[in-house]
């Protein structure tokens, strides 16, 4: 009876699920999520990322950003994720946030990811952002600080001596801010061989800091983090340990996050992806170079560049349509990327509903 009541409260999700399967098949919908790495500049030297090595001379300027977001293309945007590089290195980050919120009347959540290096600067930027946002419309300003292990491990992964102390101090400072301002703070940890055996300790650290922690798997692509570093390669034993961690910890539940981890485990064992993805129809990814993509997996997925043509023409153009079709055939079935999965599961609905019912029935036979 309880399960039935829960499902009866889901007509909106049902309608969204039908719309998801209509969008991208019969029509090209307006984007509903923005992924915007606002700069390649970074003050970290992470072993699993090469963005800090990129040329920053072509970083998109504030007037071009203003021009891009003057389009009506963004009227359906619900989520915005601003990252980098290190986004707080941009002095105009607050103005970027203001421009985007003004362009997105249906915006519900804004996410900002930071490496936590430079506590004073980060706190200043967040206060500047809080000052310009309209929280009457915005449900959440979410800030994620990345911590990739305990002190020695984190500093080794980050490539910055003393990085752990800086980042944990940033967490403490932002936690204090969250007591007075409407921000939601979290810690993000990328699972990799160097920190595989510290995940329990990281959860303990998060509890002491009174901040939720989220794990994600190590990923590689041609835009963010191509690396031949042997420290990033899981041994056979480490891979088995990783699978055990997923089975016993990360996939043990009924949330959309648990669904993803269970699906990833299946993919690690040879199955094709079951998780829906928002990137093939709903995500507008704008890069510091001005390039627009649906996804960062392959170099051929570039739709166009806002320095050459308007955002709406790029989004609805023939090249974008061809790229999306090719992606669905060549990339999506074997893609294990996490980004956009929870958003897509909420919109697609039916995949998660099957998972939810199966788990609830098995838990309550």
Residue ranges and their predicted role:
Residues 2, 6, 13, 135-306, ...:
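Radical SAM enzyme [4Fe-4S]-AdoMet core and its adjacent flexible, acidic
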Residues 3-141, 221-222, 348, 365:
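Conserved alpha-helical substructure of the radical SAM core
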Residues 17-18, 30, 52, 274, ...:
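Flexible mid-to-C-terminal extensions adjoining Fe-S/redox cofactors in radical SAM and related proteins
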Residues 33-59, 64, 79-83, 186-192, ...:
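Soluble, non-transmembrane catalytic domains of enzymes that act on hydrophobic metabolites at membranes
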Residues 41-43, 53-54, 87, 117-118, ...:
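Short, solvent-exposed loop/turn segments at secondary-structure junctions
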Residues 46, 91, 121, 154, ...:
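Activation segment
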């Amino acid at each position: 009876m309880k399960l039935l009541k829960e499902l009866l409260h889901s007509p909106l999700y049902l309608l969204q699920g039908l719309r998801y399967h209509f969008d991208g098949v019969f029509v090209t919908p307006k984007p509903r999520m923005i992924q915007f790495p606002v700069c390649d500049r970074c003050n970290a030297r992470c072993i699993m990322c090469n963005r800090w090595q990129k040329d920053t001379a072509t970083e998109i300027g504030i007037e071009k950003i203003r021009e891009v977001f003057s389009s009506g293309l963004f009227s359906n945007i619900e989520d915005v994720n601003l990252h980098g590089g290190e986004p707080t290195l941009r002095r105009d980050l607050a103005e970027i946030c203001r421009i985007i919120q003004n362009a997105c009347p249906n915006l519900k959540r804004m996410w900002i990811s930071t490496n936590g290096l430079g506590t004073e600067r980060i706190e200043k930027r967040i206060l500047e952002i809080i000052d310009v946002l309209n929280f009457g419309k915005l449900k959440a300003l979410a800030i994620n600080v990345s911590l990739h292990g305990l002190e020695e491990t984190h500093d080794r992964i980050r490539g910055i001596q003393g990085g752990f102390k800086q980042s944990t101090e940033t967490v403490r400072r932002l936690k204090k801010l969250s007591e007075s301002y409407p921000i939601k703070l979290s810690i993000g940890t990328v699972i990799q061989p160097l920190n595989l055996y510290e995940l329990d300790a990281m959860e303990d650290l998060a509890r002491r800091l009174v901040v939720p922690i989220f794990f994600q798997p190590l990923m590689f692509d041609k835009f963010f983090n191509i690396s031949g570093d042997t420290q990033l390669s899981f041994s056979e034993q480490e891979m088995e340990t990783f699978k055990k961690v997923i089975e016993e910890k990360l996939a043990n539940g009924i949330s959309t996050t648990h669904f993803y981890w269970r699906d990833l485990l299946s993919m690690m064992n040879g199955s094709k992806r079951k998780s829906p993805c928002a990137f093939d129809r709903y995500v507008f990814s704008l890069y510091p170079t001005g390039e627009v993509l649906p996804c960062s997996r392959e170099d051929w997925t570039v739709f166009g560049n806002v320095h050459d043509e308007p955002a709406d023409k790029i989004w609805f153009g023939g090249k974008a349509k061809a790229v999306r079709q090719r992606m669905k055939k060549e990339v999506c079935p074997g893609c294990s990327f996490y980004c956009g999965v929870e958003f897509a599961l909420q919109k697609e609905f039916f995949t998660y509903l099957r998972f939810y019912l199966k788990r609830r029935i098995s838990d309550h036979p």
